[in-house]
């Protein structure tokens, strides 16, 4: 428990830095939220009245002080684009982004880890070259380009995929009863199989588009860690003892791969949450990424600051989860930390 508290306390300076930088950078962005809120037909006097109502006429340090006081009370402000509290908006949209990122990560893991292990056992062979080629290709193409390409091929040309217009075709299906906010999980809990199939069909293309970019770091780290493990003394001893190859790989070598792979998975998942911004725009996904884009376009300071702060907190929690997992896999981490 002391290990966890030490890690949490160590994140406080980082979160303070995020709050300060996000506030001042968002206020330095071009655009006037008062003018956006007033509309194109508003005159200068109306815009000034709205600016005063929103508190934007105050000096920047005074605005920052009020922002920090509101944060201390759990208030992230009110979004100009939706009219709702930012915290409410983020809570409503976060499950959609987590669902998409989780499926993308599962897709990447299911391909990258077996491929990395297989490539390491056949160094410089056909599988190894194929692995390195796939890693290079998956890292070379932007996620939004892959998403657009998939939409063109699988929806427009072949007609295999549903319309890329969100999480569910709500003309045909109603969302499942809200439990977690993730449609696939909620449909599974409710036992609503038609909605589950419909939600999965909407999820496949964006998850694969996002997951392809995650293949590269996971496969690369898995291959490198497995090569290092296979070249270690204890593996050579196990081979000399006549142990089955499968047991050597899965029981001894793969255990040593878990620590570096788990570390990179935390970073990859946080990256996927950030990359949702582009994929959600392509597929009409109603997540926090699309919300952030709308907020930036409208110079919606409160929404932008809330999004960045939420991402920072999620990143901290992901790293804490990775540290705890590393401690369970290798107790030496507890003492080294």
Identify the residue ranges that each predicted region occupies.
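Alpha-helical transmembrane segments of integral membrane proteins
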Residues: 1-3, 94-127, 143, 175-337
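Hydrophobic alpha-helical segments of integral membrane proteins
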Residues: 8, 50, 60-76, 86, ...
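Residue-level signal for discrete positions within transmembrane alpha-helices
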Residues: 11, 93, 97, 133-140, ...
């Amino acid at each position: 428990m002391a290990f966890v508290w030490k890690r949490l306390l160590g994140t406080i300076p980082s979160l303070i830095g995020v709050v300060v930088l996000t506030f001042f950078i968002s206020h330095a962005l071009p655009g006037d939220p008062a003018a956006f809120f007033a509309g194109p037909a508003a005159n200068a006097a109306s815009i000034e009245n709205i600016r005063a109502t929103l508190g934007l006429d105050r000096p920047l340090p005074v605005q920052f002080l009020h922002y920090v006081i509101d944060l201390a009370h759990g208030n992230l402000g009110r979004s100009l684009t939706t009219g709702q509290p930012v915290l409410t908006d983020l809570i409503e949209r976060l499950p959609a982004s987590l669902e998409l990122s989780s499926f993308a990560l599962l897709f990447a893991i299911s391909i990258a880890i077996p491929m990395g292990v297989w490539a390491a056992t056949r160094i410089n062979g056909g599988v190894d070259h194929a692995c390195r080629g796939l890693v290079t290709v998956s890292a070379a193409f932007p996620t939004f380009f892959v998403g657009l390409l998939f939409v063109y091929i699988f929806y427009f040309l072949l007609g295999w995929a549903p319309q890329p217009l969100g999480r569910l075709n709500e003309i045909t299906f109603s969302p499942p009863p809200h439990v977690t906010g993730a449609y696939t999980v909620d449909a599974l809990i409710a036992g609503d199989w038609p909605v589950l199939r419909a939600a999965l069909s909407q999820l496949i293309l964006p998850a694969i588009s996002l997951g392809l970019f995650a293949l590269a770091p996971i496969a690369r780290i898995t291959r490198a860690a497995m090569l290092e493990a296979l070249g270690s003394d204890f593996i050579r001893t196990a081979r000399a003892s006549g142990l089955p190859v499968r047991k050597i790989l899965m029981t001894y070598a793969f255990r040593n791969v878990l620590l570096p792979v788990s570390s990179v998975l935390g970073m990859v998942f946080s990256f996927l949450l950030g990359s949702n911004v582009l994929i959600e725009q392509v597929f009409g996904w109603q997540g926090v990424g699309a919300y952030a884009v709308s907020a930036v376009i409208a110079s919606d300071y409160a929404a932008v600051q809330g999004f960045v702060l939420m991402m920072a907190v999620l990143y901290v929690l992901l790293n804490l989860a990775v540290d705890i997992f590393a401690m369970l896999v290798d107790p030496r981490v507890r003492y080294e930390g």
